[in-house]
């Protein structure tokens, strides 16, 4: 997890490989180890996801955003996952087959088309509390809910 409180002021930094010594992250500082920064982009619980050169950010209270992973440029800003309703997220998003998946604490799995356009494809319902990030192993996806463990494979 990011370790940041979701107060809208926590940054995301992209650090270049091979950086050495003290990396200066102070506002306005210039450090060649920092590729780019987004000053207000960090979630609290979910980790960010880089997939096909895009950085996807899922925020704890139901917003989803996308940035160019190489430059930090905003592709699309915070979009509410569910219109007019707060949707809590603890688990981190994952990607597979040109899709990005976001599993809410309510047990709803939001399936987005991966890419530069915000496009919700479907919502799959588990109808049970989900707090853990799904695991992947040996060609299967494992989803743990409050009372069940699902294994999904082709």
Give the positions of each predicted feature:
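Noncatalytic, solvent-exposed loop/strand surfaces
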Residues: 1-154
């Amino acid at each position: 997890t990011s370790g940041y409180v979701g107060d809208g002021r926590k940054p995301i930094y992209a650090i270049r490989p091979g950086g050495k010594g003290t990396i200066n992250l102070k506002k306005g500082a210039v450090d060649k180890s920092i590729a780019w920064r987004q000053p207000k982009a960090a979630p609290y619980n979910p980790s960010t996801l880089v997939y096909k050169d895009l950085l996807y950010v899922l925020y704890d209270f139901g917003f989803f955003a996308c940035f160019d992973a190489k430059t930090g440029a905003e592709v699309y800003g915070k979009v509410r996952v569910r219109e007019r309703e707060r949707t809590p997220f603890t688990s981190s998003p994952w990607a597979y087959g040109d899709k990005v998946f976001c599993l809410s604490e309510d047990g709803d799995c939001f399936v987005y088309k991966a890419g530069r356009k915000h496009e919700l494809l479907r919502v799959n319902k588990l109808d049970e509390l989900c707090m853990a990030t799904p695991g992947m192993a040996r060609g299967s996806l494992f989803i743990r809910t409050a009372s069940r463990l699902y294994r999904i494979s082709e």
